[in-house]
Amino acid sequence: MGLASTVSLALLGLCSLARAQTSAADAYVSAESPIAQAGILANIGPSGSKSHGAASGVIIASPSTSNPDYLYTWTRDAALVSRALVDEFIEGESSLQSVIDSYVSSQQKLQRVDNPSGSYTSGGLGEPKFNIDLTAFTGAWGRPQRDGPALRAITLITYGNHLLSSGNTSYVTDTIWPVVKADLDYVVSYWNQTGFDLWEEVSSSSFFTTAEQHTALRLGATFATAVGASASTYLTQADNVLCFLQSYWNSNGGYATANTGGGRSGIDANTVLTSIHTFDIEAGCDSVTFQPCSDRALSNLKVYVDSFRGLYSINPTGATDPILTGRYKEDVYYNGNPWYLTTFAVAEQLYDALNTWDKLGSLDVTSTSLAFFKQFDSSITAGTYASSTSEYATLTSAIRNWADGFLEVLADFTPADGGLTEQIDKSSGNPTSAADLTWSYASAITAFKARGGAIPASWGAAGLTVPATCSTGGGGGSGGDTVAVTLNVQATTVYGENIYVTGSVNQLANWSPDNAIALNADNYPTWSVTVNLPANTQIEYKYIRKNNGQVTWESDPNRSITTSASGSFTQNDTWR
């Protein structure tokens, strides 16, 4: 029996079905909130009860050391978890300030740890994970991952802006700004280069990464001005990134394509997480920035949820029932299960949308979002519905109940002690994969807060327009059309050794071994990477090995390819 069922069993017999559903969600929020909060704090060093050995301020992904081993700190996870804590601090949880300050200090140190992705000034900020004692993890991994610096910048700027409003300028300018500036400069330099996605599996351009990079640059420009620094570069590149962000939209399918590579459908929780983590209520239902109530984000949400119908035997079977969702339907990791954090994200997007409609006093139904709204009113047509209309009341009430339904199905599969793992077994319903996943706890907190009407700080999304002319210039891009080139190389390696590629164009780091592009070893001994390269261009390149700081180049001569005018192709090589 799930946690909420245990808590609210007596209540359910006293209420109508609709009220019982709400009571179940209420009970789950009430019971799980303190458990999730404690779960986060237990996973933060040095004094967290489940984070023994972690340095001060280090947020571990999970205390699990086997099947899987997640006893590391990921820049992405830590930034998202810290953002949840920062939002709570801003809302009045003053006891969290020391925890947040410790996180800031840990990131100061972590940025300067040399690692397989590079150093502080040569790409090392894109390293995805570190040991919990703030030393480099040197094993094979999907690196670099370029969302981490952007997410960390967003978290620290949000914290810094609040401190500035309270008059604490010296800490912001002396401590927070240098960390933020390094991350923003990394984004400027690398936003138009490929990297691994948030699931650490696909090396390409990623919707989530691009959106977070845009948010970081936009927020960073304002923050730079506030501390007396130059903002022009951040603003210029923010416009370019916003332009690139539009390219992910699949108008035929009605969803945002999660990755430009990977060979999957592109329907992915990546996109739902994008919507909630770039939420800015001041932007209303703007589709350019993929706001939660925008027609594109709502269409995308329906396509994403529907992709899991019939996939997991533990799920309800109704055509519009709230269900458990996973990362993407083709997932095979741990046999491909639903995840807590992805299902919480669905509910959170819906609550964010409801909060925005309440603020606006109306909602719009467009041809893009019509299929989403027809789930709740089959007779609804495109148009604007004021909050005074019966249609508005019908739709928003049904959508709130639907959002609560996702919490209720999560409650059914939350153990009685409230502990949240990474995944839920798709057949048995038992918790599986990493125990006490910090990101799972944070996703519960942010969904619950959104349900209660919490609104995160604005980041400047209101009123943005896509530039008439888009550029990939600045930060390693060369502009013009590109084609996706997959490079495969057969290479046997020793433990700790990784394969990279560099070459004669910016996208291949201009022959820089420090900034060379990492290949992944998912199909070892074949190492692979997909890179967007200039079209109709002759390009020279070589593979290199890196091991304990030592670089070994392939033998001469340089390899050479001539890219096509459009499309994509694969180049198969063997190390020499």
From Swiss-Prot:
Pfam families listed in its UniProt record: CBM_20 (PF00686), Glyco_hydro_15 (PF00723)
Signal peptide positions on this chain: 1-20
Compartment annotation: Secreted
PROSITE patterns cross-referenced by the UniProt entry: CBM20 (PS51166), GLUCOAMYLASE (PS00820)
Reaction catalysis annotation: Hydrolysis of terminal (1->4)-linked alpha-D-glucose residues successively from non-reducing ends of the chains with release of beta-D-glucose
Disulfide bonds: 243-470, 285-293
Record-given protein name: Glucoamylase ARB_02327-1
Source species of the chain: Schizophyllum commune (strain H4-8 / FGSC 9210) (Split gill fungus)
